[in-house]
Every structure is written in structure tokens, then in C-alpha cells.
Amino acid sequence: MTDDPAATPRPETSVNARPAFSGQAPIKAEYLINTTPIVESASASELNNIHPDDAAEGRTDSRDSRDGRDRPDNKRRKPNKQDKKDKKGQNKGRHFPVIREASVRICRAWETTGICDRADKGDCRYAHSWEGYFEVKPNDISYRPDWSLVGEAPFVVEGERVVGGEDVVGKTLDLDTVCPVLKDLGYCPFGWRCRFLGAHVKRVAAAVDGEKEKEAGPEKRMGEWQVENWVQSEVENGWKQKETNWPEHEVLNALRRSTASFPFSEAYLKKVDPDKPFTLQNKKPTKQQPHKRKNNVLDEEEAANGPTGIPSAGDDEENAMNATENERNEEKGKVYGEPEAIDVPLRPEEKRRLNWEGGRYLAPLTTVGNLPFRRLCVDYGATITVSEMALAQPLVYGAKEEWALVRRHESEKMFGVQVAGGFPNRMVPAAEVIANTIGKGGGVDFVDVNMGCPIDLVFNQGAGSALMDSPGRLGKLLVGMNRALGDIPLTVKFRTGVAHGKPNAHKLIPRFVTEWGAGALTIHGRSRQQRYSKPADWEYIKTCVTALRESVADANLPPVPIFGNGDCFSAASYYEEMDRSGVDGVMVARGALIKPWIFTEIKERREWDISAVERLEGIKKFAEFGLSHWGSDTQGVNTTRRFLCEALSFQHRYIPIGLLERLPAKLNERPPAYRGRNELETLLASPFAGDWVKISEMFLGKVDEGFSFVPKHKSNAYGGEEAQG
């Protein structure tokens, strides 16, 4: 590499100019690309035909608009510390606007029932007719699941679009398309708004003026077209659209208005903190504040214990709850000692047993661990899944965006809800409302407490890994949740400790089981301070396993499963880590994000040299699952596209094992510039967001105007100027 910017391309726009560094993946020489600058455009397509001999001819314009050459003084400024920092890390404060049809906004009440009470009063601002809607509605997305996928461009061998006709409705239709929602559910609740409408309409004789009377219900006929299989799904026995955990509207309204009752939480918190009044008052109950997770779609670094406009735990509460056990009055802080007290933990036989030995456990993953992704992992062989991290305070305040995170698909046979929070006066009510709503219908098999989140905004509020340094507060929190959940097991996920070199997990583990009643444990083999920068410490995990086994035996308790977590990236490493540490299983996190098929490898105890076409099949499944979950209208398609790009922002880091000189691959190794064994494999390895959008277009149609995508981790964004920021 040279210091001359004319010869060294910008790292964020050149795949083939990455310098060699420790931790570089050993790729076979025939797949390597010469590090001499050759590619400046943000696309992987130019890499397919590049050979080392082309290096001298490949560069057409070496000027960098940011190298300072165009300034009057023609002086080049050396990059400072901030410049270097800006080129790496995370894109924070990402914003994803909601993209709907650029057309007449149809009243949802009228659309689904044919009636709008507000329209009769003249105060509904939405349209109550489909007139004008199809004049601007985008054409159907052409999609058939039986289309062939191939390794060379165009990658998807599509059929011809079959247009419905020249009329205003027919010209938007593709009569040969397949609606993924209809395919999955047997009906489509999106009716005329479906972007795959041609799959569920039929041509009927045009009605003569005055011949057709208005039928009750939604309008199912437009000119010579009639929509079929349009069903407005309702919650039946807790299930809707093959998903469960739909709290009743009355329950959410009561939570928002602070009229819901928490009898157990009130009694328990009065017991452990008699001087502190129990209150869950939402200061703005009449107008629910927009949830930050909705507006900015929070990633881990933006999650806090309270949404915008809703008060979080105050300084007085934090000071009181953070007080050490020695500072507490013994009678006030004592949790155990009275057999009849409400805060005595349930006996082990009163809780459901978690028989997890050998289970294939997918970690809770904020943003990317959504329901369609979990469904994909289950399809590959995962047997234990957990929701994205839900924040206790928004759950207690009835934020619908937070409750959407706990949704469960019918394919998830062992499913838990992970809750984060720092204080008993939020976590115990959250456990109580979970038990009384989704817990009664079998919607949750266990509740997991997040004690591992390392990010500052969570840690500084006493939640996540901060709980490990506050055992007094932690004990009250866990015991209260355990009692509130009834027979639903409570599990904990934690790190080795807060500070590097000062682990304390082994001291807490005996108390987790014998005092606080945890039904299963998961330990991430890094401290909060380490984040993900160092390899997981499996020797320390072994120490923790020994501490658990001894404490369980001494207390004469039934076996309690313990899982390890950290750096699992292959079947070989999975079983090696299990044998070395003695854990009952290994929770897979980043490894599943990069290669969701790792669960197939673990199940079959093999290393899978998965082909590019097989990987594309998995991407197609994710798109189908996403449309079933988020919807097949324009808004649902764009939401699916956004989360598909999120998934590809991790999956592009996978290096095919057929290209490696040694196995198994290591999670933290990064590849030098390389090309795949075919065009598709090269495309799937692209770090450019524009290429991820191109991949999404294979199954979700052309991107809509206004769509932009900013990767969670810095890379080339796709979209307008705001996206580039």
C-alpha cells in the first residue's frame, strides 16, 4: 500500500484495497484479487471478471473528491483522529421513513368493513372510495416461488408478466404472480392494496349501471375485477395469521391510561420497599407519545429504559434502589425468612422444567432478531428462540411497538420473551402483565432477564450488565419477577462481569439458582468492558459451570441447564466448546446472523459448503416470511426490504468454506478482497448497501422512490443525502 491517495482508493468504496492485518481469513490464492486499486464504484458486479493482470488497466479516474486537491492552496490535510473515527463503528440515530402508496389514503375502517362512523359525521379525512387509487398504484410485483435461481446474472430466471388488461385495474395486475401471504395463510388480509393482487383476483362480468346493489362489508368488486380470498383475520384463541401474543386492545388501553391493576407487584414492592410508594403513572395518558423504536427503529445503542415523553426512573429512585444491602434496614430489605411471605420464591417443583440439554439456542438479537429471521433459523434447525429485547417500562405503559416485539410464530416450539430494565418497580410489573396476558394462553415458555447488554444508555440506567454489580437490587428484581410469573420459568443471560479482569459471575451463579429461582442460565464469556473485542473466555465459563453444578448438588435441587455464549461459528467450534466447558449447549448469536444455516451444521455435525444458490434460497424464504409478518402492501414490502437489507449487512461477511485454506472459519477473521466461484457468490459477498438493495429486488420488486437504507455498521448507504450521513 502507498500513502499516495491517487493510488489508494477510499476504503469505504473499494472492496479490493483492504490492507493485510492480523485476523485475516486464509483465502485460497486463486480467489484473491490484487490489492492494486481497480474498483471505485460501490458495486460487486465489477469484481467478477477481474484478474491480477488487469490491475494496471483497471483504474480510470484516481482522483478523490475529498483528497483536498481541488482546494485553492492545493494542500492535502492529514486525516485527524475524528476523521478516522468517522469511518468506522456504527451509524447512530438511523431514520427509516414509512413509505406507503403515493396515492389516495383509504380509510381503514371503510376498507375493511364498508362503514365509517366518522365519515357520516364529516370528520374523516381519508377517502371512502377506490376511485383514483389504481391510477397511481404501482404495478404488481412479479414473483413465483418456482422460478429458477442460478449462479450467473440475472440470478433469478423470471417468466413474462401477464398483464390483466387495459382498464385502470387490469393494467396494474400480473395474473401470473404469486402472493406469499396467500401462499402462507390461505388468504390475504390486504385486499386491493396487496402488491401481488393478480394472485387473488378474478375477472367477472361488468355490472350494468343500476344493476348491482351495494353489498354489506368491504367493496370486493372494481369494474370487471373481483378480489378473492380477502379475509380480515381476527384473533382466535390467542392466534392470528399463525402468530400469537396479541394483547387485547382493552389491556393495552388500560396500560396506556394507567388504569391497569398490578395487585402482586403492589404488594411485593410494598414489602421490599415500604417507604417508596408504588406508582406506574403515565404523565401523558391521553396522547401516547411516538415510540422511539418506531421512529428511529432503535438499535442496541439507542435502547433506553423509557420511550420519549415517558418518564424513566428518576434520580431519587435510582439512588434508593442502588443502595447496597448494608445501607438497607434489615427488615425493609429482607426477602427471605418468613415462610408465608409473598416474596418467598416458588419451589422448583412449582415451575415448569426446562429440558434444554442439546437444544439449539438462537440468541435474542436486537433489530435483526425479528420474527421472520427467527422463523428462518427454526427452518434451518434452531429449537430455542427468544424475542428481541423488550424494555420493561414501555411494556408496562402499553406501547404497541414494544408489545409487537414479543410476537411468536407457530413454528417456534420453545419461545421466550427477553425483558430489560434496572429496577424492581418496572421489571416486576412487566413480568406480572406478561403472565396475565400472553402467559395464560401458552404464548411464552420462559421469560429471560437481560443482564448482558453493555451499551452505555442501558448500563447507565442500572439495567443490562449493570445489574451484576448490584446484587441486592438484582435479588429483589429476580425474586419478584419469579413470583409474578407463576409457573413460567425465569432465566437469566449475563456476562462474566462488568470490568475486564474482575469477573464476578461465578459468585452470582449459586444465588441465581438457590436464592433467586432461575430456571436456566446463559453466560456470555466476555465482560461488559470487553464488548466483542476479545475472544470469549471458555475457561471461565467452565469455572461457572462447576460453580452451578456444585451449588445445585449442595441444595439438592433438580438439574438447571446452563448455556455458554461467544464466538460459535461452526459445528466444530460448537461441540468443542461444549466438551471443553461442560455446558448443556451453546447459544449462537453473531454466528447465526452471518450464517443462519449454522443450526443445520450443528444438527448434522458437519461443515456445510453451502452454494450461492442455496444461500439465495434462504434469502427468498426470509422475504416470504417478512411479507407474511409485515404485510404485502407497499408499507409491508418496504419494511420487509429494510429488514432484509439488515440481514444482508451481516450475511455478506460469510466466507464460503470452499474458498478457505483451512477450517473451521473463525468469527472475527475478515477476508482480503476476493471473488466468489460464480457471479452470485461475489454479489452475496458485497459490502455495499446498493448491492443488498439489488438482491432484495429479486423477490420484492423494484425499490420505491424515497426508499433509503443506512446500515447499522458503517458502509455505503443507499438512498438520498440523509442516508449518506
From Swiss-Prot:
InterPro entries: Aldolase_TIM (IPR013785), DUS-like_FMN-bd (IPR035587), tRNA_hU_synthase_CS (IPR018517), Znf_CCCH (IPR000571). It comes from the Eukaryota. A zinc finger (C3H1-type) spans 101-131, 178-203. Its EC number is 1.3.1.89, 1.3.1.-. GO terms for biological process: mRNA processing. Residues 284-295 have a biased composition (Basic residues). Residues 1-26, 43-95, 275-339 are annotated as: Disordered. The active site is at C453 (proton donor). FMN binds at P364, L365, T366, Q418, K493, H524, N565, G566, D567, A589, R590. GO terms for molecular function: flavin adenine dinucleotide binding; mRNA dihydrouridine synthase activity; tRNA dihydrouridine synthase activity; tRNA-dihydrouridine47 synthase activity; zinc ion binding. It is found in: Cytoplasm; Nucleus. Its cofactor is FMN. It catalyses: 5,6-dihydrouridine(47) in tRNA + NAD(+) = uridine(47) in tRNA + NADH + H(+); 5,6-dihydrouridine(47) in tRNA + NADP(+) = uridine(47) in tRNA + NADPH + H(+); a 5,6-dihydrouridine in mRNA + NAD(+) = a uridine in mRNA + NADH + H(+); a 5,6-dihydrouridine in mRNA + NADP(+) = a uridine in mRNA + NADPH + H(+). It is an enzyme of class 1 (oxidoreductase). Residues 51-73, 80-89, 325-337 have a biased composition (Basic and acidic residues). Keywords: Cytoplasm, Flavoprotein, FMN, Metal-binding, mRNA processing, NAD, NADP, Nucleus, Oxidoreductase, Repeat, tRNA processing, Zinc, Zinc-finger. PROSITE patterns: UPF0034 (PS01136), ZF_C3H1 (PS50103). Catalyzes the synthesis of dihydrouridine, a modified base found in the D-loop of most tRNAs. Specifically modifies U47 in cytoplasmic tRNAs. Catalyzes the synthesis of dihydrouridine in some mRNAs, thereby affecting their translation. Belongs to the Dus family. Dus3 subfamily. This is tRNA-dihydrouridine(47) synthase [NAD(P)(+)]. It comes from Cryptococcus neoformans var. neoformans serotype D (strain JEC21 / ATCC MYA-565) (Filobasidiella neoformans). The lineage of its organism: Eukaryota, Fungi, Dikarya, Basidiomycota, Agaricomycotina.
